[in-house]
Amino acid sequence: MSIIFFIILFPLIGFLFLSTIQDFIFKRYTLNIGIFSIFISFFITCFYGVSILKNNNQVFTQILWKWLSINEFKIDFGFFLDGLSLSMLFVITGVGLLIHIFSSWYMRYKEGQSRFFAYTNLFIASMSVLVLADNFLFMYLGWEGVSVCSYLLIGFYYTELKNNLCAFKAFILTRVSDVFLMIGMFLIYREFNSFNFQEIKFLSSFLNVENFYYLDYITLFLLLGVIGKSAQLPLQTWLSDAMVGPTPVSALIHAATMVTAGVYLIARTHFLFLLTPGILYLVGLIGTLTILVSSISALVQKDIKRILAYSTMSQIGYMFLALGVKAWSAAITHLIMHAIFKALLFLSAGSLIKSCKNEKNIFKMGGLRKQLPFLYISFIVGGASLVSFPLITAGFYSKGNILFSVLKSGCIDFFIIGLFCSFLTAIYTFRMIFVIFHGKNIHTADSSTNLQHNIPLFVLLLLSTVFGSYISPPLSDVFPLSYTPIDHKFAFEIICSILSLSGIYLSYYIWIKNLYVLDKIFQFKFMRYLYYFFLKGWGFNWFYKISFVYFYLYISKRLSADPLNKIINYFLKVTQIFNFYLLKTSNGYVRWYVASMILGINFIFLLMLFFYFN
C-alpha cells in the first residue's frame, strides 16, 4: 500500500486543526500540533528514502483519483516520487521540521502563534504537492499554494501598512511570472496532448527539433514562469522586501524552499531544455547577472535580513548557472546545502534580532561574541559555508562543483563573474559577522534560550560543516549521465580557496582594522551616488514604479471619471426625459385619449400616402 499522500495529508490536517479550534486549546498544544504534523511527514519521507536507496532508485507512484476526464483530456491527482522529488522532500520536511522546532521558541510569547503554525503547515503541504505532483496542473496547484502562504506570512504582522504593501508586492510580481508559466503549460498540452511529466519526457525523445519550433517558446515561457518565484532578474525585487515577516518564515520560505521551486521545475523538465540550447544558455545568463547584481547589493546593506536575502538571490543564481551548463546534479546538491546553511544563518539572525530587542541594523550591534558565543559560532560556520571556506564546509564542495562545471563547459565569461562574486560573497558575509560580533560593544543582548532554540541550530551547524558534504542525493536515474573531466581541479580549488580567504581578510582589514578607509572612499561624490544606487537595488524598483506603477495610477485616475459611463448616462437621461413627458399624456381625460387616437390614425394614414406615392 502506497502512503505517499500522508506526506501532504498530515500538514494539511495540522493546518485545518490549528485554523478551526485554535481558540479552544492551550497555546502550548498548538506548538505541538504544528511540529508533530511535520515530523510525521519527515518520518514518511525517510521511509521512502530508505526504500529508494535499497531498491536501486526505485520510483513510486500513486493515483488518488481522476480529477478531470473529458473525452481524451484526462487529469489525475497523482504523485510521482523519484530521486529528485525525494531530495526536495528532505529539504521541505527535514529543514522545515527544524525550523518549526525553532519557531516554538521564537513565537512562544508572540501574538498569532496558532495562525503562524497554521500557515506554515499549509505551506509544507503546498510545497510537498509541488514536488510530488506527476503533472503540470497538479503541480500548479502547489505552485499557487506556496504563493498564497508566502503572501500570508510576509504580511503576518498585518497591523503595519508597510508589511501589507510588501506582501502585495511579492504576490503581484510572482503573479506576473506565473502568467508566463501558464502559457508555457498550455503550449505543452497543445504540442504533447498531455500534462504528465513522464509522458512528456517519453514523447520529447521522439521529437524532430528542426521541425518543432514551438519548443523554444515552451522552454522560454517556462523560464519566464520560474524567475519570479526564484527571485531572479528582472523580477527579483520582492525578496528583499519580503523580510518584514517573522524571521523563521524567511528561513523556511524565502531561503530554503519556495524560492528554489524554480530550480526544481527546470530540473524536472530538463529533457525539454536539453532540446533548446539557446534557452538553456539564457538560464545561465540570468543566473550570472543575478549573482552579480545581488552580490554587489549585499555589500552595502545595513539590515541583517536584507543582507541574507541578497545572498539568497545570489546562491539561487549559482543554481541557475549550474542548470544553464547542464550541471543538473550540482545544482540540486547546492540547493540542499544552501537550504541547510542559509536556514542556519536566518535562524541565527532571528535569535540575534530577538536578543537585541528587534534591532536589525548591524552597525547598531557590535562586540556580541562574548554575550552570545553560541550564535557567534553559528554565524561563523554558516557564513563559512556560504563563502565556500576550503575543506571544512559543505558549501566549498557544492558551489565548487558548480563553478568547475561552468569552467569545463567553456563559458569562461560566466565562470569569471561567478568566481569574482564568490570573492564578493566572502567580503559581505564576514563584513556582517565582524561588525556584529567584533569591535565595540554597542548593544546589550538577552541570551536566554532553551533546547527548542539550540537543537535545530546545532543540527544545521553540524550539517553545514564537512559532514554535510557526504549528503549525496539519488539523482543518477533522474538526469542523463554526464562526465566532467577532473583534470586541473586541484588548481581550481586552490584558486577558489585563495579568493575566499582573501575576501575574509579584506573584510577584516576594512571593517575591523582600518575603518578610516571607508571614510576616504566616500569622500568622492561619485562613490556616494554609487553607494546609494546599489543600496536601492540598482534602481529596479524605481524603474518599475516609473514604467508600470505610475502609468497604472495615471490610467486609473483617467478611468475614475469613466467616459463610457458618461455616454451610458446620457442615453439614460434622454430616456428619463422622454418617459417624463410620456407620463404627462396619462391625465385621465377621455377626450384627450380619443383625440390622441384620431391624431395617431391620421398620422399613420399620412405616412401610408407618403410612401405609396413615392
From Swiss-Prot:
Its EC number is 7.1.1.-. Its main location: membrane. The keyword Translocase applies. The keyword Transmembrane applies. One of its GO terms (biological process) is ATP synthesis coupled electron transport. The chain crosses the membrane at residues 1-21, 33-53, 79-99, 136-156, 168-188, 207-227, 247-267, 271-291, 327-347, 372-392, 410-430, 455-475, 492-512, 533-553, 593-613. It is an enzyme of class 7 (translocase). Signal peptide: none annotated. GO terms for cellular component: plasma membrane. It is found in: Cell membrane. It is a multi-pass membrane protein. Keywords: Cell membrane, Membrane, NAD, Quinone, Translocase, Transmembrane, Transmembrane helix. GO terms for molecular function: NADH dehydrogenase (ubiquinone) activity; quinone binding. Pfam families: Proton_antipo_M, Proton_antipo_N. NDH-1 shuttles electrons from NADH, via FMN and iron-sulfur (Fe-S) centers, to quinones in the respiratory chain. Couples the redox reaction to proton translocation (for every two electrons transferred, four hydrogen ions are translocated across the cytoplasmic membrane), and thus conserves the redox energy in a proton gradient. Belongs to the complex I subunit 5 family. Composed of 13 different subunits. Subunits NuoA, H, J, K, L, M, N constitute the membrane sector of the complex. NCBIfam families: NDH_I_L, PRK06590.1. This is NADH-quinone oxidoreductase subunit L. It comes from Buchnera aphidicola subsp. Acyrthosiphon pisum (strain APS). The lineage of its organism: Bacteria, Pseudomonadati, Pseudomonadota, Gammaproteobacteria, Enterobacterales.
